[in-house]
């Protein structure tokens, strides 16, 4: 019987990262989305192309063997597909997980297969599958919760691949960097074993992979974006061509490296090599990635467990240095009223209407007695003072 994966999110990451590797692994992919335009395009097209870009050139793969369902109008079809699938993945954004959970819960509840469904959230957030699992349990009858592990297993993942903004006329085709990393927990699958997806690096402990990725790739990428935006740069490559900004990114990643090395017992040499790889990757001019795209959704990016406050708070607790991370936070807080970015508008409103300490709590989620908190308040106060 053919393997089937149901994937929520027909966007660039869904088509260009997750679906590409599911397709390569021999799965039929069923895309689920609420965007009429994406679903219609997928339904009316037999294939699309994923072009991997590197300094060595380009390589194009053709993706076929997929279907698409609009969950807004055909939820029962989505439930039926999940009930007979091998894998469910998603790349919808952490804030959307609660909206896709009801259909997944119903699909899981309808399963009769001997092997449980593998559920893997592919989001830029720590513990995203745990979050989705929580929402699914909220949408499952109490008397069915105890037997849910017979029907589904949930594994957190760490994904790493840069998907830049796409050309307006690209249609379903996706340009994407060649490099990728997709690490997924293996332990939740127990005696059933994990699904067969060669692109996945199966690990027993995911936290080192998630934190190393989030606090290096995402921290460095966002730092370049926010400093670049405030310096009038157009692309990430242009920002990193500026020796001042490149030096700042290195300083920030030196701080996060000290945390990663100390906490996860990764060698300094290995982490330094990883940092150099990341800086080379995000400097790639062929990706043509804009500072606005990488910087979008600043409120999520300055939140408690994210790329700035996450490492800075842990460094503060350990007595480490976090001054450069505070600089990144400041630049992120100056990413206000950017066209097409609702969070940047809301950010400006919060900073305008709240006292520094109140704004710091609301934006970062830090407790007022946390050792990092007074330093964050000082940054917020400085940004607010400049706006007066």
Swiss-Prot record:
Tell me its family.
Answer: Belongs to the mannitol dehydrogenase family.
What reaction is this protein's catalytic activity?
Answer: D-mannitol 1-phosphate + NAD(+) = beta-D-fructose 6-phosphate + NADH + H(+)
Question: What subunit structure does UniProt give?
Answer: Monomer.
Fetch the InterPro entries from UniProt.
6-PGluconate_DH-like_C_sf (IPR008927), 6PGD_dom2 (IPR013328), Mannitol_1_phos_5_DH (IPR023028), Mannitol_DH (IPR000669), Mannitol_DH_C (IPR013118), Mannitol_DH_N (IPR013131), NAD(P)-bd_dom_sf (IPR036291)
Task: Indicate the enzyme's highest-level EC class.
Answer: oxidoreductase
Q: What does this protein do?
A: Catalyzes the NAD(H)-dependent interconversion of D-fructose 6-phosphate and D-mannitol 1-phosphate in the mannitol metabolic pathway.
**EC code:** 1.1.1.17
Which keywords belong to this entry? NAD, Oxidoreductase
Amino acids binding NAD(+): 5-16
Which species is this UniProt entry from?
Answer: Penicillium rubens (strain ATCC 28089 / DSM 1075 / NRRL 1951 / Wisconsin 54-1255)
This entry's Gene Ontology molecular function terms read: mannitol-1-phosphate 5-dehydrogenase activity
Q: Which GO terms describe its cellular component?
A: cytosol
The protein's name in its UniProt record: Mannitol-1-phosphate 5-dehydrogenase
The active site annotation covers 213
């Amino acid at each position: 019987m053919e393997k089937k994966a149901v994937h929520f999110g027909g966007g660039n990451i869904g088509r260009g990262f997750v679906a590409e590797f599911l397709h390569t692994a021999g799965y039929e992919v069923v895309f689920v989305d609420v965007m009429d335009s994406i679903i219609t395009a997928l339904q009316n097209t037999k294939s699309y192309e994923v072009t991997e870009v590197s300094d060595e050139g380009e390589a194009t793969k053709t993706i076929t063997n997929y279907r698409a369902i609009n969950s807004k109008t055909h939820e029962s079809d989505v439930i039926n597909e999940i009930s007979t699938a091998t894998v469910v993945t998603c790349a919808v954004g952490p804030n959307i997980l609660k909206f896709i959970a009801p259909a997944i819960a119903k699909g899981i509840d309808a399963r009769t297969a001997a092997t449980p469904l593998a559920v893997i959230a592919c989001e830029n957030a720590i513990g995203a599958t745990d979050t989705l699992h929580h929402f699914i349990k909220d949408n499952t009858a109490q008397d069915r919760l105890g037997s849910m592990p017979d029907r589904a297993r949930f594994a957190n993942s760490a994904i790493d691949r840069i998907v830049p903004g796409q050309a307006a006329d690209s249609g379903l085709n996706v340009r994407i960097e060649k490099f990728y990393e997709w690490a997924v927990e293996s332990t939740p699958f127990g005696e059933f074993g994990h699904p067969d997806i060669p692109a996945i690096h199966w690990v027993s402990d995911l936290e080192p992979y998630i934190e190393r990725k989030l606090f290096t790739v995402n921290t460095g990428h966002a730092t370049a974006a926010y400093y670049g935006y405030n310096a009038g740069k157009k692309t990430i490559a242009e920002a990193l061509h500026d020796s001042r900004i490149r030096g700042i990114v290195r300083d920030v990643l030196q701080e996060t490296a000290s945390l990663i090395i100390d906490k996860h017992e990764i060698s300094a040499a290995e982490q330094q090599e990883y940092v150099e790889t990341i800086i080379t990757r995000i400097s790639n001019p062929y990706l043509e990635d804009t500072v606005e795209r990488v910087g979008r959704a600043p409120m999520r990016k300055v939140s408690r467990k994210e790329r700035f406050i996450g490492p800075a708070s842990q460094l503060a607790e350990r007595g480490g240095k976090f001054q450069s991370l505070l600089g990144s936070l400041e630049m992120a807080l100056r990413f206000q009223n950017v066209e097409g970015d609702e969070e940047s508008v809301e950010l400006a409103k919060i900073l305008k209407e709240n006292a520094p300490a109140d704004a710091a709590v609301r934006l970062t989620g830090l407790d007022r007695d946390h050792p990092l908190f007074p330093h964050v308040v000082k940054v917020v106060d400085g940004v607010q003072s400049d706006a007066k």
